[in-house]
């Protein structure tokens, strides 16, 4: 299976808004050179919700931002599948955020590296060889 990197929502947002100081340099290089980079479909909802609630400011309308932040930028939208939902509900409930559990399950399903600065992710033994 080719190496894929799954971006947590905040990493995706920082990349698209060029807020590079938040992303470790090694990660940025790995993301730029990876054969495949993707985000969980739930990340689109997470961005939309955060924008609606005023927790983040987008430089353009949401629909335009989402379109530009995906394929034109080289980011693949990874679908939410039944297998991913089953993995997510079967994870040990370390992380209470269902969005993050779906992102973790997406990375596991794709056997992908996961780029996230969420400190709870490292508590999942399943992610031991997958976290960047």
Segments from the language model and where they lie:
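Alpha-helix capping/helix-boundary segments
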Residues: 11, 43-44, 84, 103, ...
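Acidic, PIN/NYN-like endoribonuclease modules and their adjacent C-terminal/linker elements
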Residues: 2-4, 104-132
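Active-site neighborhoods of divalent-metal-dependent phosphate/nucleic-acid chemistry enzymes
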Residues: 59-63, 71-117
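Short, well-structured N-terminal submotif of metal-dependent ribonuclease cores
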Residues: 1-39, 53-68, 124
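Histidine- and aromatic-rich ligand-binding microenvironments
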Residues: 8, 40, 96-97, 118
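Conserved beta-strand segments of alpha/beta enzyme cores
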Residues: 36, 76, 128-129
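Generic structural signal for small/hydrophobic residues in well-ordered secondary structure
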Residues: 8-9, 47, 88, 107
């Amino acid at each position: 299976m080719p190496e894929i990197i799954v971006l947590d929502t905040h990493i995706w947002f920082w990349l698209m808004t060029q807020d590079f100081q938040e992303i470790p340099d090694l990660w940025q290089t790995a993301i730029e050179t990876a054969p495949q980079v993707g985000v969980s479909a739930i990340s689109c909802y997470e961005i939309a919700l955060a924008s609606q609630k005023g927790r983040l400011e987008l430089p353009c309308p949401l629909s335009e931002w989402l379109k530009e932040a995906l394929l034109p930028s080289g980011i693949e939208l990874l679908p939410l599948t039944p297998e991913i939902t089953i993995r997510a509900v079967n994870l040990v409930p370390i992380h209470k955020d269902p969005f993050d559990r779906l992102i973790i399950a997406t990375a596991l399903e794709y056997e992908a590296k996961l780029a996230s600065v969420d400190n709870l992710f490292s508590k999942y033994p399943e992610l031991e060889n997958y976290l960047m």
